[in-house]
């Protein structure tokens, strides 16, 4: 097993300097592994994401040194099902396994034999468990969005710096070749200076999907999380955790091992962060990567002027159209990031010499300039129709979704990525972005090398802040100033005068995040 730095970490001079600093902060694990011993992984949260997306990936890391030994969930059926899946997987490979099913994550964090945890709970639990895990000396993989609130994002960032743990945010698109290719073209200035960026997600307020921002569902009886007969297999008080007490609901916590998606809790403002925290956490993350803002953020938020939604399910609020304005690190000029509904492309970068558009399983590059993009231009790009002033360089648009390895399985996409890499000489470009084969594999390798991951706490935390700023703009129907250094409202900001808080509205005693 060769886990040296050059084997999987690549960066520009600036990125290398940051990595070196981060390396010094990654302390050793709390226990020393014997020769041939595996690092023990605890899965916390065995819903559809933890069970079907993350557990198989962690099981696949056995050969590089990690073994799942605990499945933790406050739902008895889910944790026992998870433990059985683990034992069955290892048994088929002739590997001894006695995976434990644990009800309370606090018991997991007290266990000195656990080396790393994977957190795949609903959003409202992420920050508390992540910080407590780091305090306990565990390395942490946490699903996106990293946090429920902006204040929690600041605390998770501070906790990683304080406790020096290896930390990975589950923003797995960064580990996909198609997204890295797009970001490499942008970061190397190959389409000129970036002036505008689109992040497209959500349903534009249509009845087809949930709201961009979480809402108070009890305000709409037809869509409320209705009371249900108590589920004897769920510790409901633990499921609620820091959120307000409410009666058990089958909609919030569907019974047993199921395939229910999208999760109802995602759009309830006591538990989730809406589409901004769901898909926004992916496409805003790629925008953040492409414009080199992993350690910064916008300085101004501009209110949407799109129509209000007309149904209570979307809160009667605007669903897209807000903008975030960043200062370019190159020359201080403005970069406008727009939240749009033009769904073909997750992230679109508009430069002075071209356009790059990317999504899962698809990428397109045009040369030329369109200036400030209009709705007509955005729709034409989404439909792959001609746009005056632009010439297609290369495009592959035949596939919507896939796994981390999907890029390798789609021959058309692989060919397009190679065409772009060759044309723009990306392998020898001056800016080399972190190259990760897989988000989980990268995390496990970093456990052994003590190197920073591709999506450490600051990257994930900054991304969560973008999601939170989007939600704030829609919920309060406002624009405002932002201090990206302090990660706070600037003095005199209208939000301060309105009494808007960066903290969660309510937190039950005992579950406050304390660094």
Residue spans of the language-model regions?
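Core domains of carbohydrate- and sulfate-ester-processing enzymes
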Residues: 198-256, 374, 379, 383, ...
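A contiguous active-site-proximal alpha/beta segment in oxidoreductase catalytic domains
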Residues: 139-141, 147-233, 237-238
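Active-site rim elements
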Residues: 169-171, 225-226, 266-277, 305-313, ...
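Rossmann-like dinucleotide-binding domain that binds NAD(P)(H)
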Residues: 227-332
């Amino acid at each position: 097993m060769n886990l040296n730095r050059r084997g999987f970490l690549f960066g520009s001079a600036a990125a290398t300097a940051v990595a070196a600093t981060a390396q010094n902060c990654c302390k050793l694990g709390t226990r020393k592994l014997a020769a041939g011993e595996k690092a023990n992984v605890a899965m916390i949260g065995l819903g559809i994401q933890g069970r079907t997306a993350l557990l198989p990936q962690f099981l696949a890391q056995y050969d590089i040194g990690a073994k799942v030994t605990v499945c933790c969930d406050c739902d008895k059926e889910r944790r026992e099902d998870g433990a059985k899946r683990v034992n069955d997987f290892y048994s088929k490979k002739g590997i001894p396994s006695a995976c434990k099913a644990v009800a309370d994550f606090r018991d997991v964090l007290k266990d000195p034999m656990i080396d790393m945890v994977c957190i795949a709970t609903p959003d409202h639990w992420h920050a508390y468990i992540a910080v407590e895990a780091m305090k306990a000396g565990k390395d942490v993989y946490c699903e996106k969005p990293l946090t429920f609130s902006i204040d929690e994002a600041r605390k998770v960032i501070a906790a990683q710096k304080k406790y020096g743990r290896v930390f990975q945010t589950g923003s797995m698109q960064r580990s996909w070749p198609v997204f890295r290719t797009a970001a490499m073209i942008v970061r190397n200035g190959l389409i000129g200076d970036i002036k505008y960026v689109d992040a497209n997600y959500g349903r534009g307020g249509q009845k087809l999907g949930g709201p961009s921002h979480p809402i108070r569902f009890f305000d709409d009886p037809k869509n409320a999380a209705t009371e249900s007969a108590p589920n004897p297999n769920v510790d409901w008080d633990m499921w609620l955790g820091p959120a307000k007490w409410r009666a058990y609901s089958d909609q919030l916590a569907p019974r047993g091992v199921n395939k229910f998606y999208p999760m109802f809790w995602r759009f309830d403002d006591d538990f989730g962060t809406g589409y901004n925290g769901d898909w926004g956490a992916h496409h805003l993350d790629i925008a953040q990567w492409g414009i080199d803002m992993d350690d910064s953020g916008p300085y101004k938020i501009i209110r949407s002027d799109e129509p209000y939604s007309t149904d209570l399910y979307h809160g009667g609020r605007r669903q897209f159209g807000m903008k975030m304005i960043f200062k370019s690190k190159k020359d201080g000029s403005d970069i406008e990031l727009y939240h749009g509904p033009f769904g073909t492309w997750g992230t679109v970068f508009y430069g002075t010499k071209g356009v790059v558009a990317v999504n899962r399983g698809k990428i397109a590059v045009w040369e030329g300039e369109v200036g400030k993009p209009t709705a007509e231009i955005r729709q034409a790009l989404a439909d792959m129709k001609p746009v005056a002033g632009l010439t297609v360089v290369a495009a592959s648009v035949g596939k919507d979704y896939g796994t981390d390895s999907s890029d390798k399985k789609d021959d058309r996409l692989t060919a397009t990525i190679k065409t772009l890499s060759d044309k723009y000489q990306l392998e020898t470009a001056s800016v080399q972005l972190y190259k990760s084969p897989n988000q989980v594999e990268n995390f496990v390798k970093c456990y052994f090398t003590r190197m920073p991951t591709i999506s450490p706490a600051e990257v994930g935390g900054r991304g969560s802040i973008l999601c939170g700023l989007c939600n704030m703009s829609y919920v309060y129907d406002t624009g405002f100033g932002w201090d990206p250094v302090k990660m706070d409202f600037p003095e005199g900001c209208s939000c301060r005068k309105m009494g808007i808080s960066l903290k969660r509205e309510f937190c039950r005693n005992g579950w406050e995040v304390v660094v």
